């Protein structure tokens, strides 16, 4: 068919400008026939490929839009989770501060109570030691008083008075011993 078209084109060129109606009709028929063949064998598949390509692009656009929406949704969820995490962290910090303050107050109160207890125990110990010292002092004073009194009595009594006292004492002991 192509060969026929070439022959017609060469024949028209050989006629040097003369219009040959047979050649025109032949070229017209060949053109129409070529268009029909192109439509049947090339245009349909070409349009099918174009349609597939268009559908593929539309599908890709739809998928990209869905992925974009999913990404936006995921981003919003992540932002919300981050916001919640920050709020939880803030709450935890506030609770930790409150707990630390409460523990500090408990420790201070406990330390004050312990200091007061130690102070009271020290006062009691001091008072007990003071009483012991006073008792020991009284004993020493009493012992010294007896010693001084005995020394004074020894000096004031004559030897004869001392003998009478000793004999009276021995007699009293014998009476007590005999009374048993």
UniProtKB/Swiss-Prot annotation:
Entry's transmembrane regions: 18-38
Cell compartment(s), UniProt: Cell membrane
Top-level taxon of the source organism: Bacteria
One Gene Ontology term, aspect cellular component: plasma membrane
Cited InterPro entries: ATP_synth_B-like_membr_sf, ATP_synth_b/b'su_bac/chlpt, ATP_synth_F0_bsu_bac, ATP_synthase_B_chain
Major site of localization recorded for this protein: membrane
The keyword Transmembrane belongs to this UniProt entry's keyword annotation: yes
Disulfide bridges in this chain: none
Keywords associated with the record: ATP synthesis, Cell membrane, CF(0), Hydrogen ion transport, Ion transport, Membrane, Transmembrane, Transmembrane helix, Transport
A UniProt-annotated Pfam family: ATP-synt_B
Record's bilayer topology term: Single-pass membrane protein
Family classification: Belongs to the ATPase B chain family.
Subunit structure: F-type ATPases have 2 components, F(1) - the catalytic core - and F(0) - the membrane proton channel. F(1) has five subunits: alpha(3), beta(3), gamma(1), delta(1), epsilon(1). F(0) has three main subunits: a(1), b(2) and c(10-14). The alpha and beta chains form an alternating ring which encloses part of the gamma chain. F(1) is attached to F(0) by a central stalk formed by the gamma and epsilon chains, while a peripheral stalk is formed by the delta and b chains.
Protein's job: F(1)F(0) ATP synthase produces ATP from ADP in the presence of a proton or sodium gradient. F-type ATPases consist of two structural domains, F(1) containing the extramembraneous catalytic core and F(0) containing the membrane proton channel, linked together by a central stalk and a peripheral stalk. During catalysis, ATP synthesis in the catalytic domain of F(1) is coupled via a rotary mechanism of the central stalk subunits to proton translocation.
Name of the protein: ATP synthase subunit b
């Amino acid at each position: 068919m192509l060969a026929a078209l070439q022959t017609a084109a060469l024949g028209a060129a050989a006629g040097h400008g003369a219009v040959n109606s047979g050649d025109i009709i032949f070229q017209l028929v060949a053109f129409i026939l070529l268009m029909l063949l192109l439509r049947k064998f090339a245009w349909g598949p070409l349009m099918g490929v174009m349609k597939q390509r268009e559908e593929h692009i539309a599908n890709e656009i739809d998928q990209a839009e869905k992925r974009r929406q999913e990404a936006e949704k995921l981003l919003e969820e992540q932002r919300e989770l981050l916001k919640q995490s920050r709020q939880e962290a803030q709450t935890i910090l506030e609770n930790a501060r409150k707990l630390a303050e409460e523990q500090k107050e408990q420790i201070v109160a406990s330390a004050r109570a312990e200091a007061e207890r130690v102070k009271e125990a020290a006062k009691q110990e001091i008072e007990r030691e003071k009483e012991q010292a006073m008792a020991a002092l009284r004993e020493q004073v009493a012992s010294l008083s007896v010693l001084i009194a005995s020394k004074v009595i020894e000096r004031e009594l004559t030897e004869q008075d001392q003998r009478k006292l000793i004999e009276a004492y021995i007699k009293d002991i014998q009476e007590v011993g005999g009374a048993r």
